[in-house]
C-alpha cells in the first residue's frame, strides 16, 4: 500500500512538471502625438532540469525551484515603413549546492526607416551575481550596458531584488530594480496571487535616458498547468501601451 501511494504521488508530481515554455505576444503603442505602433513577439525558455510546480503559484514555480535556464526572444514591428526589431538571448544559473546565482544576457535593437538614412543598431548586455539568503528571496548586483553602432556606449552598475512570500493565505511577488549612472533607470513591481493560477499586479518604470515614465497594471491566468494568458496596460506621460501574451509549457 505504501509503495503504491508513493508511486501515485510520483506520477502526479511528474504530470505537473515542465521543462520548457514558449510564448507569443502582441504589443500596441498609442502615442499622444504621432502614429500608433504594433509589435509581435515570440519567446522561449528551456530549463536544464524539469520544474516541479508543487504548491507554489504557477507563475513563480521556476524561481522558487531555483531552475537554471537559457532563454531567447524576438520582437518585430513594421509600421508605415518604420521597422523595429529586438532580439536577445540570456541565461540564469543557480549554482548547485549553494545559495549563489549568476545571470547574463545580450541583445540587439535595430530601427530602420524606409527612404531615409535612419538605420540605428544598438547592442545591449547585462550580467548579475546574486545571493538567495532565504527561501523566495534573491538579491543581486550587476552591470548593464549598451553600445550604439557609430555612436555612444556606456555601462552602469545595477541592483535588483525579488521576493516571493505569503501574506495570510495568499502569495505575493515583490520586485525592484535600479541602474545608476548614465542610464538612471529604475523599476518596481508587485503581484498579488488570488490563487495559485491567477494574479493581479501593478508596476512603475522610469528611464531618464529614454525619457520614459510609465505606470502599469497587469493580470495573468493559468487556464491549466500548461497554458497561460496575460495582459498589461501601461499609462505614460506621452503614450499608453497595451500588451497581451499567451504561453504553453511542456
Predicted regions, residues:
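Beta-barrel outer-membrane channel/assembly domains of diderm bacteria
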Residues: 20, 26-32, 40, 46
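Subset of outer-membrane beta-barrel
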Residues: 27, 42, 72-79, 83-86, ...
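Mid-chain, structured segments of secreted extracytoplasmic proteins
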Residues: 54-88
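Active-site beta-loop-alpha junctions enriched in small/polar residues
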Residues: 27, 75-77, 107, 144, ...
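Cleavable N-terminal export/targeting peptides
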Residues: 1-21, 33-36, 52-56, 64-67
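Feature captures outer-membrane beta-barrel proteins of Gram-negative bacteria and organelles
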Residues: 39-51, 59-61, 86-97, 124-134, ...
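Short, conserved beta-strand segments within well-ordered enzyme catalytic domains
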Residues: 23, 45, 71-73, 90-92, ...
Amino acid at each position: 500500500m505504501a509503495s503504491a501511494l508513493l508511486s501515485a504521488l510520483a506520477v502526479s508530481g511528474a504530470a505537473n512538471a515542465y521543462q520548457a515554455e514558449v510564448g507569443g505576444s502582441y504589443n500596441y503603442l498609442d502615442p499622444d502625438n504621432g502614429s500608433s505602433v504594433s509589435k509581435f513577439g515570440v519567446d522561449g525558455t528551456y530549463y536544464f532540469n524539469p520544474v516541479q510546480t508543487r504548491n507554489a503559484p504557477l507563475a513563480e514555480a521556476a524561481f522558487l525551484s531555483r531552475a537554471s535556464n537559457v532563454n531567447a526572444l524576438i520582437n518585430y514591428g513594421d509600421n508605415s515603413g518604420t521597422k523595429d526589431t529586438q532580439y536577445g538571448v540570456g541565461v540564469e544559473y543557480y549554482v548547485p549546492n549553494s545559495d549563489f546565482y549568476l545571470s547574463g544576457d545580450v541583445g540587439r535593437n535595430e530601427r530602420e526607416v524606409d527612404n531615409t538614412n535612419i538605420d540605428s543598431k544598438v547592442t545591449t548586455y547585462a550580467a548579475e551575481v546574486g545571493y538567495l539568503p532565504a527561501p523566495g528571496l534573491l538579491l543581486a548586483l550587476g552591470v548593464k550596458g549598451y553600445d550604439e553602432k557609430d555612436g555612444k556606449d556606456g555601462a552602469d552598475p545595477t541592483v535588483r531584488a525579488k521576493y516571493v512570500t505569503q501574506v495570510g493565505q495568499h502569495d505575493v511577488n515583490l520586485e525592484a530594480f535600479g541602474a545608476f549612472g548614465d542610464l538612471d533607470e529604475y523599476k518596481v513591481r508587485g503581484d498579488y496571487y488570488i490563487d495559485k493560477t491567477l494574479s493581479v499586479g501593478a508596476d512603475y518604470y522610469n528611464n531618464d535616458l529614454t525619457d520614459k515614465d510609465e505606470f502599469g497594471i497587469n493580470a495573468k491566468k493559468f487556464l491549466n498547468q500548461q497554458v497561460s494568458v496575460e495582459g498589461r496596460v501601461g499609462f505614460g506621460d506621452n503614450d499608453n501601451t497595451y500588451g497581451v501574451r499567451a504561453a504553453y509549457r511542456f
